[in-house]
Amino acid sequence: LQIPLPDASYDVLICNHLLEHVADDRRALGEFYRILRPGGWGILLSPVDRSRAATFEDDSITDPAERTRIFGQYDHRRIYGRDYGGRLREAGFEVREIDYAARFSAEERRRYALPDDWIYVVRRPL
């Protein structure tokens, strides 16, 4: 996987529910880091099962029905756990993990259909 863009060519990066689909997410993160300029920032959203300490992935699971049963969707390759932010840090990013929905009451979360997903804001250090 190589993104056909020059190094340090973007100020902002948004990745919304992509990394769970790619074969080598760490390499993809490395590419995101490479194309983001120093001081640039991004939002990297993925489904994270906060009840899991560690990400679960098994490349031997290729059957779509089995992937759906295990990962929740036929085209997912992993289930991220609470270590997701750590994966982003391993790529070199500074990471802020924001539990956005926590600022709302249970009633407000229901009324506005706010998911329990966290927001991961990354920054490439200067």
Predicted regions and their residues:
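Class I SAM-dependent methyltransferase SAM/SAH-binding core
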Residues: 1-2, 50
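A short acidic, Gly/Pro-enriched loop at the edge of an enzyme's catalytic core
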Residues: 2-13
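A short SAM/SAH-binding and catalytic strip from SAM-dependent methyltransferases
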Residues: 11-23
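S-adenosyl-L-methionine-dependent methyltransferase catalytic module, highlighting the catalytic core
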Residues: 23-126
